[in-house]
């Protein structure tokens, strides 16, 4: 299939995903508002209070019900976006049973992580008084750092098989590249993504002693070694520029602002909805609504910051490898294999994309000179 036809398919794929994003956003807002105004949250809170007088148990039971209900409510949209659409565009290798198993794993993970975090969050709300937004922000900061460290060793293996890379030549090249940016890596791993998808990916994942290089088999099988090297050089550019720390700092700042806005929204809404305290679990949909709306408003700013770091990482990749041709080839292959729109509408890119468009990255690389 020639590039023009592939890009036509990519634009259709992008357009459908953009519509799906709008549908999911409206659907989420509708569910939260309905849960509040139809008093579903009040009924659920009354039920959990009848089970125990312990507030930790109240929040835990409420959290389990909400997590399971959310998964069920979004199952049709998840099926359409993650299974049907991927198969329709020839991107998925995953059977329905395997997809359903991944959904169950995702549910179990949300329960295992989300419910304890919700319990600790409401403990902070009960104890922190007017400084609750600072306490909650510190909680989310700690959670983000821990998850960044544990992701490659605990979370990723739940969904993908990981094994040490057998290509010794490539392993040595990537390890040497990591040493050049001052990164110590535990190892280089091959990730069996082809069981689920035809898309290619790579990551420089983990923190400290969990940091490792991860390469999808779909990347290893389709890309030349110099192309893989430049893709990983981009990821290592993030490390070289301290982007993990900067992204955590940026995320912490926006989280604090979001939680402060949510605190104001909670106090404004509680009086109108009849809730007495911010730690009333029945008011959770109001808290979620405030955070969700802030997230939507802040998304373009967050994406702009992310895109600025991606440009820096691209520059680092070209400086580290001095291989502009491999960079351009890799970008074009990623667009083709992942069915990415090379030139999304500028408004769509500004609002929804955390990476610059591949066409702009390629054009920039074509103009790049090492000095």
Give short role names for the model-derived ranges.
Residues 1-278, 292, 297-371:
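Polar-ligand-bearing catalytic/cofactor-coordination segments
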Residues 286-290:
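Alpha-helical transmembrane segments
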């Amino acid at each position: 299939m020639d590039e023009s036809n592939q890009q036509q398919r990519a634009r259709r794929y992008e357009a459908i995903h953009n519509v799906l994003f709008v549908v999911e956003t409206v659907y989420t807002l509708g569910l939260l508002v309905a849960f509040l105004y139809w008093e579903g949250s009040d009924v659920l809170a009354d039920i959990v209070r009848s089970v125990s007088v312990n507030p930790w148990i109240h929040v835990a039971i409420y959290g389990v019900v909400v997590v399971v209900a959310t998964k069920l409510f979004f199952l049709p949209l998840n099926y359409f976006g993650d299974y049907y659409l991927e198969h329709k565009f020839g991107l998925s290798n995953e059977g329905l049973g395997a997809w359903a198993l991944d959904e169950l794993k995702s549910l179990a993970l949300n329960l295992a992580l989300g419910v304890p975090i919700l319990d600790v969050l409401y403990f902070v709300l009960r104890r922190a008084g007017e400084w609750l937004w600072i306490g909650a922000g510190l909680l989310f900061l700690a959670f983000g750092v821990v998850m960044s460290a544990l992701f490659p060793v605990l979370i990723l293996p739940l969904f993908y098989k990981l094994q040490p890379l057998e290509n010794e030549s490539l392993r040595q090249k990537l390890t040497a590249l990591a040493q050049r940016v001052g990164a110590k890596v535990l190892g280089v791993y091959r990730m069996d993504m082809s069981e689920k998808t035809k898309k290619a990916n790579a990551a420089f994942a983990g923190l400290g002693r969990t940091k490792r290089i991860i390469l999808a088999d779909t990347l290893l099988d389709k890309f030349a070694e110099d192309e893989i090297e430049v893709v990983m050089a981009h990821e290592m550019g993030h490390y070289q520029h301290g982007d993990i720390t900067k992204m955590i700092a940026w995320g912490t700042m926006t989280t604090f602002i979001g939680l402060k806005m949510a605190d104001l929204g909670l106090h404004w809404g509680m009086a109108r909805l009849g809730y007495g305290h911010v730690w009333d679990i029945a008011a959770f949909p109001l808290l979620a609504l405030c955070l969700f709306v802030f997230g939507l408003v802040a998304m373009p700013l967050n994406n702009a910051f992310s895109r600025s770091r991606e440009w820096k990482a691209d520059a680092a990749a070209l400086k580290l490898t001095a291989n502009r041709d491999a960079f351009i080839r890799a970008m074009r292959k990623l667009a083709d294999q992942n069915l990415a729109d090379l030139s999304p509408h500028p408004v769509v890119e500004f609002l929804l994309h955390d990476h610059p468009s591949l066409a702009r990255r390629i054009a920039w690389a074509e103009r790049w000179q090492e000095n």
